[in-house]
């Protein structure tokens, strides 16, 4: 099994180009079911993207892959969808597989999707997905680990209030509503930029969507959607990760190819810690200037601080001057990186959904194990900060969400290699 070997103590200096957003491209790929052909550019080279390709092919899609140095182009032909079951063997690898449920159901009137997998960071039930589709007229039962959904005729527009903010359920509802009969109004929607990107793609395909980027989205269903080409936005989670990498290594890095407005909340949190963050053309520059203050953090739905960056921020706070409180409000099991950070000398105590982090002068290298995607990269950041050797095991998680991570870090002076 592969592992990463990191020799830390080297400040990162240089430029890092940000890849396409995983959390945007996956629902856009699922949206290809709603039309006959979709051309997607700026697609990151990730195993989750490969899993979604496998899933779409299992439904009968034909996918042409055009490979470039830093990205893929995908041409997805879905005119011959002939299988409406998303099997466990594919779905277990990635929770985003559930996003084929809405498109299959709204276009073909039936779908059978295995209950999803992905990182083991909490229950993340599918109740809201099912509730909104039932409100649109679907008949849904859960049998033998599968969601069996059907509708007599087209789904019907509805007014639906999400009782909690859910990125996944908001996406499935939008994907279903664009071909439903009549008007759908969704309340308490998630606001993530990746949802905005999906809506922009669907609008370009001919969907009628109002309220994009707000908590109230109105969709007037169409009979069909058009073929088109769309460029996926850049990955704010990847950008934030490298911003923290620059800070924890006392470096100076330009993060390129990302709109500042979607990472502004990350930048403001870093500025609180004493790190210099300056917008530049098509990106941001992060510079350590000798100070790293302890700052409290709470994860919340966007525009709050992303749960996908909580572990990385915690790594940074292990070296801060003082005590910080990190509160995880999204997932109930997202502190699995804490024992591994403590193996490296961090002083962290977890109490329920809160972690108290007391800054130490220095972390030390150790053999550590990744438990999930974001935890794995937090341990890399910790390893980069040490003056010794860190070995990270179970790095297959990384390839689900970070393209060319070792290359991007090495180009900025890091000593990191995969063996």
Curated annotation (Swiss-Prot):
InterPro entries cross-referenced by the UniProt entry: Enolpyruvate_Tfrase_dom, Enolpyruvate_Tfrase_sf, MurA_subfamily, RNA3'P_cycl/enolpyr_Trfase_a/b, UDP_GlcNAc_COvinyl_MurA
EC number assigned by the record: 2.5.1.7
Modification 2-(S-cysteinyl)pyruvic acid O-phosphothioketal, positions: 119
GO molecular function, one term: UDP-N-acetylglucosamine 1-carboxyvinyltransferase activity
Chain residues that bind phosphoenolpyruvate: 22-23
Top EC class for this record: transferase
Family under the similarity heading: Belongs to the EPSP synthase family. MurA subfamily.
Protein name: UDP-N-acetylglucosamine 1-carboxyvinyltransferase
Species for this entry: Rickettsia akari (strain Hartford)
Gene behind the chain: murA
């Amino acid at each position: 099994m592969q592992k990463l070997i990191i020799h830390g103590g080297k400040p990162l200096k240089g430029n890092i180009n940000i890849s396409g957003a995983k959390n945007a491209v996956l629902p856009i790929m699922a949206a290809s079911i709603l039309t006959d052909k979709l051309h997607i550019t700026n697609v990151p080279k990730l195993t989750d993207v490969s899993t979604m390709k496998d899933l779409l092919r299992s439904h009968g899609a034909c996918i042409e892959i055009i490979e470039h140095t830093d990205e893929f182009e995908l041409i997805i032909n879905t005119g011959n969808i002939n299988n409406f079951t998303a099997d466990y063997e594919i779905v277990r690898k990635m929770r985003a597989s559930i996003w084929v449920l809405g498109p299959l159901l709204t276009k073909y009137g039936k779908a059978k999707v295995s209950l999803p997998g992905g990182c083991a960071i909490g229950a993340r039930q599918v109740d809201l997905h099912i509730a909104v589709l039932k409100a649109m007229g679907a008949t849904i039962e859960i049998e033998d680990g599968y969601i069996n959904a059907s509708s007599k005729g087209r789904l019907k527009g509805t007014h639906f209030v999400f009782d909690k903010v859910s990125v996944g359920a908001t996406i499935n509802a939008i994907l279903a509503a664009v071909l439903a009969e009549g008007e759908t109004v969704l309340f308490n929607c998630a606001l993530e930029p990746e949802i905005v990107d999906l809506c922009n793609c669907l609008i370009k395909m001919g969907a009628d969507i109002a309220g994009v980027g707000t908590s109230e989205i109105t969709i007037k269903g169409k009979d069909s959607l058009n073929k088109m080409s769309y460029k996926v936005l850049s990955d704010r989670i990847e950008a934030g990760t490298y911003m923290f990498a620059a800070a924890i290594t006392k470096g100076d890095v330009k993060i390129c190819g990302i709109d500042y407005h979607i990472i502004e909340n990350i930048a403001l949190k870093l500025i609180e810690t004493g790190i210099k963050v300056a917008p530049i053309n098509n990106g941001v520059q992060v510079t350590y200037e000798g100070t790293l203050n302890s700052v409290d953090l709470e994860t919340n739905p966007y525009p709050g601080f992303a749960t996908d960056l909580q572990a990385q921020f915690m790594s940074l706070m292990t070296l801060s001057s003082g005590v910080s409180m990190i509160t995880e409000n999204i997932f109930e099991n997202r502190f699995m990186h804490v024992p591994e950070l403590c193996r490296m000398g961090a002083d962290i105590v977890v109490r329920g959904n809160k972690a108290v982090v007391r800054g130490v002068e220095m972390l030390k290298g150790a053999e550590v194990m990744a438990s999930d995607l974001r935890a794995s990269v937090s341990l890399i950041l910790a390893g980069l900060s040490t003056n010794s050797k860190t070995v990270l095991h179970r790095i297959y998680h990384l390839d689900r969400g970070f393209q060319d991570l070792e290359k991007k870090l090495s180009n900025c002076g890091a000593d990191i290699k995969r063996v």
